[in-house]
């Protein structure tokens, strides 16, 4: 019996070698927190900050991922606080119940299309500019404002380094 010199055909059609239908994952195919949005390929930085604007937890997602998707994993990393202040992008029943279960008061304005309205402390909500100032300080560094790093791990490492400096 003569063996074919084209051994790759055996694997391609279910012969010897890899099991049929099984493929090697693409190199670099793991999540690199790059998403497509109107502005092109982007990365979204989710952050928890304390009352002085120091980042306590950071998370990266693709730019096309909704803000609410990063909220619970980020909040689960830290102990519960008295209040959690967030913008309208975080107004969801499941997040409010998650915060209530932790004993935290959500200070989140209602979305315009919300049927059931929740009261929120507008004076406390004014403190939300602390996180906006934190993002401004972080993005003063060009490497953060314009993501040059290919991998999410390297970008997050640079972000953590800069957050420690700010």
List where the protein language model places each region:
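Short alpha-helical elements
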Residues: 1-166
């Amino acid at each position: 019996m003569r063996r074919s010199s084209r051994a790759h055909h055996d694997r391609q059609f279910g012969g010897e070698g890899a099991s049929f239908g099984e493929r090697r994952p693409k190199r670099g195919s793991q999540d690199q927190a790059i998403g497509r949005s109107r502005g092109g390929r982007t990365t979204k930085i989710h952050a928890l900050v304390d009352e002085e604007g120091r980042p306590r937890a950071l998370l990266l997602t693709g730019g096309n991922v909704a803000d609410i998707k990063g909220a619970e994993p980020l909040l689960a990393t830290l102990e519960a606080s008295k209040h959690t202040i967030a913008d309208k992008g975080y107004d969801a029943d499941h997040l409010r119940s998650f915060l209530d279960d932790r004993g935290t008061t959500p200070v989140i304005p209602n979305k315009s299309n919300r049927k059931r309205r929740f009261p929120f402390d507008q004076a406390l909500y004014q403190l939300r500019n602390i996180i906006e100032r934190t993002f401004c300080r972080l993005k003063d560094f060009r490497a953060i404002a314009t993501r040059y790093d290919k991998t999410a791990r390297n970008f997050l490492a640079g972000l953590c380094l800069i957050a420690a400096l700010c």
